[in-house]
């Protein structure tokens, strides 16, 4: 197999953090010497982005938003892509299962957002994944490929340079259940094959596919050893110093 593309270790803080806890954690990140080629991403709440921008000094990191809408205007409570760009944020997580589950974001809505973000120059971490019911009904492939094809339908081939896929089995998020490295690799390989056949072998070779779902310091290295796992989208463990060990696991 050809060499893996540059890995990504992404911290999705979700709706968590206080000024004090974030300052403490960012200090830990700043003091962490990372000696290999890896893109670290941290996604704080919108409110905490300026704090992290002011305090984070580790050059391996970029700051991401956890969500965004396409345009500014009369959308109370939302934050738009132009506003994020204006404050210097150029990465965004879109389609996280919590957005899909709690806020009714359909495959179509997520695909439209990913397309808009690419057009506006963002790097996008686009999330896909199946529920426990879907996995038990043997629908994993059908679900993740329909989510991926919805996104692909709205993207030019060039736009894939700005897209990172994150496979997050919904049944493994925050539950302590983790897909086995074999289960995760099976889905990652399926996704890469689909991209290879439908978008291009060149795109598939460069595409970073992250795993998300109860990733921690204990399981990260075993997961990363699989050929089609290119890093992680980390929830709970990214709020702890343990995130350093997950970054180190992507060597």
Swiss-Prot record:
Q: What class of enzyme is it?
A: isomerase
Which reaction(s) does its UniProt entry say it catalyses?
D-glyceraldehyde 3-phosphate = dihydroxyacetone phosphate
Arranged from A to Z, the UniProt key words for this protein are:
Cytoplasm, Gluconeogenesis, Glycolysis, Glycosome, Isomerase, Peroxisome
List the InterPro entries: Aldolase_TIM, TIM_sf, TrioseP_Isoase_bac/euk, Triosephosphate_isomerase, Triosephosphate_isomerase_AS
Q: Tell me the GO BP annotations in alphabetical order.
A: gluconeogenesis; glyceraldehyde-3-phosphate biosynthetic process; glycerol catabolic process; glycolytic process
- Keyword match Electron transport: no
Its UniProt pathway annotation is:
Carbohydrate biosynthesis; gluconeogenesis; Carbohydrate degradation; glycolysis; D-glyceraldehyde 3-phosphate from glycerone phosphate: step 1/1
Q: Where does substrate bind?
A: 12, 14
User: What are the catalytic residues?
Assistant: 96 (electrophile), 168 (proton acceptor)
Keyword Cell membrane appears in the UniProt entry: no
Cellular component GO terms held in the UniProt record: cytosol; glycosome
MF terms from GO for this chain are: triose-phosphate isomerase activity
SUPFAM superfamilies in the cross-refs: Triosephosphate isomerase (TIM)
- Protein localization: Cytoplasm; Glycosome
- EC numbers on record: 5.3.1.1
Q: Which family does it belong to?
A: Belongs to the triosephosphate isomerase family.
The record describes its quaternary structure and partners as:
Homodimer.
Q: What is this protein called?
A: Triosephosphate isomerase
This chain's source organism reads: Leishmania mexicana
Taxonomy of the source species: Eukaryota, Discoba, Euglenozoa, Kinetoplastea, Metakinetoplastina
């Amino acid at each position: 197999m050809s060499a893996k593309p540059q890995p990504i270790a992404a911290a999705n803080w979700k709706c968590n953090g206080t000024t004090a806890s974030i300052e403490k954690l960012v200090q830990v990140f700043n003091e962490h010497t990372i000696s290999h080629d890896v893109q670290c991403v941290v996604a704080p709440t919108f409110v905490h982005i300026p704090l992290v921008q002011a305090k984070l000094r580790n050059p391996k990191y970029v700051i991401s938003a956890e969500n965004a809408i396409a345009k500014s205007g009369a959308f109370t409570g939302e934050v738009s892509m132009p506003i994020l760009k204006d404050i210097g944020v150029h990465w965004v997580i879109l389609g996280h299962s919590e957005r899909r589950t709690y806020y009714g974001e359909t495959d179509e809505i997520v695909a439209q957002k990913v397309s808009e973000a690419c057009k506006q120059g963002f790097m996008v971490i686009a999330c896909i994944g199946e529920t426990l019911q879907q996995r038990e009904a043997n629908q994993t492939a059908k679900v993740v490929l329909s989510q991926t094809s919805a996104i692909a339908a709205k993207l030019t081939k060039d736009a894939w340079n700005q897209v990172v896929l994150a496979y997050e089995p919904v049944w493994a998020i925050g539950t302590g259940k983790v897909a086995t490295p074999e289960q995760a690799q099976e889905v990652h390989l399926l996704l890469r094959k689909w991209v290879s056949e439908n978008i291009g072998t060149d795109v598939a070779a460069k595409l970073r596919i992250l795993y998300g779902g109860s990733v921690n310091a204990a399981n990260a290295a075993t997961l990363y050893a699989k050929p089609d796992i290119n890093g992680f989208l980390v929830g709970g463990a990214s709020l702890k110093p343990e995130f350093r060990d997950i970054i180190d696991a992507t060597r």
